[in-house]
Amino acid sequence: MDARHAATVRLETIVSLAKRRGFVYPGSEIYGGLANTWDFGPLGAELKRNLKNAWWEYFIQRREDMVGLDGGILLHPRVWEASGHVEEFNDPLIDCRRCKSRFRADTLIEERLHRSTEGLSLDEMTRLVQEANLACPVCGVRDWTPVRKFNLMFRTFIGPVETESTPVYLRPETAQAIFVNFKNVVQTSRVKIPFGIGQIGKAFRNEITPGNFIFRLLEFEQMEIEYFIRPEMWEEYFDHWLNEMGQFLRWIGFKPDRLRTREHGPQELSHYSRKTVDFEYFFPFGWKELCGLAYRTDYDLRRHQEYSGEDLTYFDQERNERYIPHVIEPTMGVERLFLALLCDAYDEEPAVDVNGNPYTRVVLRFHPRVAPYKVAVLPLLRKPELVTVAREVAQELRQYFRIEYDETQSIGRRYRRQDEIGTPYCVTIDYQTLEDRTVTIRDRDTMQQVRVPISGLVEEIEARLRSA
C-alpha cells in the first residue's frame, strides 16, 4: 500500500486519536454537540499555540519589513459593503423539499456527477441537478428547490433592539481590519513600501461544511499578511511570497511530496483577486487547499477610500509620487494546518515490547518546533526515591521547555503514550540516576537512548532542538 492510498483510509483514525489524546473534542459534547463546532483540548491548545508562534516568528519577527496588528472582530457594516462581502461573499445552496436538508450545489454536482462547476451560473447548476435527476443524499427523494445565493456572513446586532438598520457582522476574514488601519500604521510605524502587516485572529463563516473533521469550520483562526507594494512590482513579490510560504511549510515539518501548488482558473478567482495560487495538501480525503496566496491589486484600499471618503494613498518619497499601493496576501488557516500536521505526522510501524510481544507502534512525528510537549520526564518506577529526583528534574526543565511529567503505568506504556502525542524526547530517571546523577534521553523517532548528566541536561535538549 503506497503512502497516498494509506492516507485515504485513516481520517477516522486521526479523529479517534485527536479525541482520545486530548487534541480536539466535539463542541458542546455534554449537550449532544453542535454541528461543525469543535473545542481544542490540552494538547490541541499547545499545538495551536506552537503553530501560531512559529508563523509569527517566521513571517513577522524575523523580517524588518513586517509589523503586527490585532484588529477587532466587529467592524463598521460599511466595511463589508466596501470590501464586496455583502454582495459577493456567497455560496450556491440547494434544498431538498422533502426532508429540508440543505447542500452546497457546487459540491453536490462535483461529487455526484464528477464534473467541475467552474463558471456555471445558478440557473445552469439548477438545470444540471434536474437533468441528472439527482437524489437527495439524505432521503433519496428527487425534489429540489432552485439553486440560490446564500451569504456566508454571520449577522448580529448592537444595542438592545434588533432592527435591520443596526446589523453588524462577525468578520469572515481578518484582512479588512488591516486595510482600514493602513493609514494609521503608515502614520505611526515609519514603514516604507514595500512592507507588510500581519495578524492572527478569529473569523466566522456560515458555511455548509462537508464533515471532514476540522477541515472547514464555522469559527476558525486565520494567519494573514497584507503586503503593500508598488503596482509594477507585483509579479516579483508574488513569486517571493510563494517561495516564503513553501519554505515555512517545510520549516514546520511538512513532507514535500504531500504538497503541491495550483493556480486558480479565471472563474474561480475571488472578486478581489487578479491571481491566486493555493498550496494543496494530500489529505485523507484527497488533494485540498491548505493555504493560499492572492494578488488583491489595489481593490481593497481603493474601495475603502471610495466608501469612507478618506485618502488612503501612499506618498512614495523615493519616487516623489502618490499612489494607492497594491497588495499581495499570503493567508493560512490555523485549524487546517493543524489537521494537515496531524495527518502528516501520523505514522505506524511494527514493534516488539520488552516481553517480546509484537505490537503496532503509533507515532506522531511532529517537528519539535510545533510538538505540544518538547520533553516528558518519567521516573522508571513510582518509588519515592525516584519520584523525588524526577520532580526536581521536571521543575528545572519547566524553566526552559514545555514539558509533561508522568509517573502512571509501566515505563513502556508511558513511552508509547508520548510517542502517540508526538513528544520528541523522554527523560527517564532510574536507579543509576541515584548513583551517578545521570538520566537517559530517549529519542522518539529512533527510540535510541543515551545517558546524560543532569547538570548538562538542559544544554543537551537545547542542542537537539536547535539541530532538528
Curated annotation (Swiss-Prot):
Keyword Cytoplasm: yes
Record PROSITE patterns: AA_TRNA_LIGASE_II
Main location: cytoplasm
Keyword presence, Lyase: no
Residue numbers binding substrate: R104, E173, F220, E221, Q222, M223, E224, E329, P330, T331, M332, G333
Enzyme Commission designation: 6.1.1.14
Localization of this protein: Cytoplasm
UniProt entry keywords in alphabetical sequence: Aminoacyl-tRNA synthetase, ATP-binding, Cytoplasm, Ligase, Nucleotide-binding, Protein biosynthesis
InterPro entries linked to this entry: aa-tRNA-synt_IIb, aa-tRNA-synth_II, aa-tRNA-synth_II/BPL/LPL, Anticodon-bd, Anticodon-bd_dom_sf, Gly-tRNA_synthase/POLG2, Gly_tRNA_ligase_bac, GlyRS-like_core
Residue numbers binding ATP: 205-207, 215-220, 289-290, 333-336
GO cellular component assignments: cytoplasm
Alphabetical GO biological process terms: glycyl-tRNA aminoacylation
Xref: SUPFAM superfamilies: Class II aaRS ABD-related, Class II aaRS and biotin synthetases
Source species, domain of life: Bacteria
Span of the signal peptide: none
GO MF term set: ATP binding; glycine-tRNA ligase activity; protein dimerization activity
Family, as annotated: Belongs to the class-II aminoacyl-tRNA synthetase family.
The protein's role, per its UniProt record: Catalyzes the attachment of glycine to tRNA(Gly).
NCBIfam families assigned: glyS_dimeric (TIGR00389), PRK04173.1 (NF003211)
HAMAP family: Gly_tRNA_synth_B
Oligomer status and interactors: Homodimer.
Protein name: Glycine--tRNA ligase
Species annotation: Thermomicrobium roseum (strain ATCC 27502 / DSM 5159 / P-2)
Organism ancestry: Bacteria, Pseudomonadati, Thermomicrobiota, Thermomicrobia, Thermomicrobiales
Gene: glyQS
